[in-house]
Amino acid sequence: MLDKDLILNDNTYELSQISRHKTHVVEVGKVKIGGNNPVVVQSMALGVHIDADNIKSSAKHYAKEITELARTGSELVRIALNSEEVARAIPYIVEEINKEGFDGKILVGCGQYELDKLVQDYPDNIKMLGKIRINPGNIGFGDKRDEKFERVIEYAIMHDLPVRIGVNWGSLDKYLLQKLMDENSSLSNSRPSDVILRKALVMSALDSAKKAEGIGLNSNKIIISCKVSKVQDLILVYMALAKSSNYALHLGLTEAGMGNKGVVNTAAGLTYLLQNGIGDTIRASLTQRPGESRTNEVVVCQEILQSIGLRYFNPQVNSCPGCGRTSSDRFRILTEEVNGYIKTHIPIWKKKNPGVEHMSIAVMGCIVNGPGESKHANLGISLPGYGEKPVSAVYKDGKYFKTLQGDNVSEEFKAIIDNYVKEHYT
């Protein structure tokens, strides 16, 4: 049965602004995470083997990858603090990325078993980072875990470093998990084990955060994450975190996968949470193909944020998928060329033409939807489909602008784009 009142009510179609979950603002160098600040994009460097006999040269190679990620748009870059060699390399890494115009505080040190020892042995090096990450599940075990956790938190307090308390279901505190599992099994109406696992993740993160506060770390120095591999688990865990606390939240799957699977899993989980106002910083943990740059994980995060209107990074190109009416590859070739043109020119445009990242461009392949779709964009072009005249209509801000034809359609359309940018974004 149709609800005509609902269908006819204009409010049904009103696009409301995403209401962000209220969280504490955490400052990581010059980057602000949480509150009403833009959702921050971060990544993790794959890293290189640090040669103990040639620390400076190794650091230069490490910094090259970090710089590539930062230049793509990663606002924070995580590095693994997994050896003395890495700790010794930090000043040289910072020096190299400073040369490229990036602040050393974009670096986040991710420590595991070795973190307690490294902050004691290399305090002046690690304080050069913007943030450190602690995994409560493997910083230590038994009483030693509490001692090591306390020492790292005290170090962070001393050097005014924010901390991400990052729980991972692959390295969850086994004592807490076993305790909750035992309690559950003793109940007459026991719950499925996956429910208890999610509960343990949230409890581990929040208990550790409260413990850090008890030691003296302010809540505006704490970021929380609970990493899992399944989208539905991610959603349930972060909804529970948002209901239970106001800590800034770092979103991401612990391992999303390779190729389309990794991108889809990341987009599915993060988009749902972000659309519901949950999440202050994000990462796409993608498995890159051999030889593929890790910058793709930065681009995926940017695309997710732009797709739901939370942030804008580049002009949006909407393009036709093709069908039986598209008789050639011209629309595909033009789409690729337009994307390449934007990628080449966007660094200059962003400096000279503020707001250009909000621009929309449509490249369509035939007359059926071409003109209509083009009119919804700032600039649109409708290429000829099967049986149509070999001409391409260009639309500007919803109105017919001109017709292009011949062998120079691509160059002429790119010139139109460039002129539009200069005219409308100053």
Curated annotation (Swiss-Prot):
- Top EC class of this enzyme: oxidoreductase
Which cofactors, if any, are listed as required? [4Fe-4S] cluster
Q: Name one GO biological process term.
A: isopentenyl diphosphate biosynthetic process, methylerythritol 4-phosphate pathway
UniProt GO molecular function:
4 iron, 4 sulfur cluster binding; 4-hydroxy-3-methylbut-2-en-1-yl diphosphate synthase activity (ferredoxin); 4-hydroxy-3-methylbut-2-enyl-diphosphate synthase activity (flavodoxin); iron ion binding
- Keyword entries, A-Z: 4Fe-4S, Iron, Iron-sulfur, Isoprene biosynthesis, Metal-binding, Oxidoreductase
Q: Which reaction does it catalyse?
A: (2E)-4-hydroxy-3-methylbut-2-enyl diphosphate + oxidized [flavodoxin] + H2O + 2 H(+) = 2-C-methyl-D-erythritol 2,4-cyclic diphosphate + reduced [flavodoxin]
InterPro entries attached here? Dihydropteroate_synth-like_sf, IspG_bac, IspG_bac-typ, NO2/SO3_Rdtase_4Fe4S_sf
Report the EC number(s), separated by commas if there are several: 1.17.7.3
Q: Give the pathway annotation.
A: Isoprenoid biosynthesis; isopentenyl diphosphate biosynthesis via DXP pathway; isopentenyl diphosphate from 1-deoxy-D-xylulose 5-phosphate: step 5/6
Where, by residue number, does [4Fe-4S] cluster bind?
Answer: C320, C323, C366, E373
Q: Give the cofactor binding note.
A: Binds 1 [4Fe-4S] cluster.
Asked if the Swiss-Prot or TrEMBL record annotates the protein with the keyword Iron-sulfur, the reply is: yes
Function field: Converts 2C-methyl-D-erythritol 2,4-cyclodiphosphate (ME-2,4cPP) into 1-hydroxy-2-methyl-2-(E)-butenyl 4-diphosphate.
The text of the family note is: Belongs to the IspG family.
> What is the recorded name of this protein?
4-hydroxy-3-methylbut-2-en-1-yl diphosphate synthase (flavodoxin)
What is the native source organism of this protein?
Wolbachia sp. subsp. Drosophila simulans (strain wRi)
Please spell out the taxonomic lineage of the organism that makes this protein: Bacteria, Pseudomonadati, Pseudomonadota, Alphaproteobacteria, Rickettsiales
Gene that encodes the chain = ispG
